[in-house]
Amino acid sequence: LKMKLYRLKILLPFLCLFVLGSASPKMTGEEIGKYIQKKLKRNNHVLRINSKNLGDDGVAYLASSPILKTVKTLILYKGHFGDEGVRALAESENLDQLTTLYLENNNITDLGVEHISRSENLSNLKVLNLYHNQISDKGAGLIAESDTLTELQELNLIYNQIYGPGVIQLTNSTKLKNLKKIELTYNPIKKSAKDA
């Protein structure tokens, strides 16, 4: 029994570190501001933020920053944000130069896609990457019917919840005339839509 308690005593700190350390604390607005200034000093056209706990409020702070006016590529990977963060990006006048938007591994649903697909500020997008979110056929359909994403050339919807109708809408879209590449693997697409 003493040996088991001893092992548990040794393993407990590591277990706590694993469980509690898996999500870093949310970044404050001040931390985000300093971080993006540092990143944009290297290249003021590309901002990549990987595995930082931004949350919706952090993304809203980011979107409101005038320093983003020169950014053409924005990559927010595992930022722990959802539809409200996407709304802030879509409404930001600081992102009208954006041509490439990567929002991989977040909590974006069809509502977030709706914000993107209706945004005049994101009308220059050529690449949209929504890999591993919670987007369904409805979200794919919103992109397919978008009047503002007409410049889109590449779309990544890998690892979402698209079953079929969204695939058909995307492949038959009359609005996405420049779209050359659609990535849809690892979606539960039904056989009837795979031929689209």
What function would you assign to each model-found segment?
Residues 104-105, 109-147:
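Eukaryotic tandem repeat interaction scaffolds
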Residues 26-29, 33-90, 104:
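LRR N-terminal entry segment and analogous cap-like coil->beta motifs
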Residues 158, 162-196:
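Leucine-rich solenoid repeat scaffolds
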Residues 52, 79, 103-106, 130-133, ...:
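Consensus "Asn ladder" position of solenoid repeat domains
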Residues 1-32:
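Bacterial Sec-dependent N-terminal signal peptides
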Residues 39-46, 66-73, 93-100, 120-127, ...:
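Leucine-rich repeat
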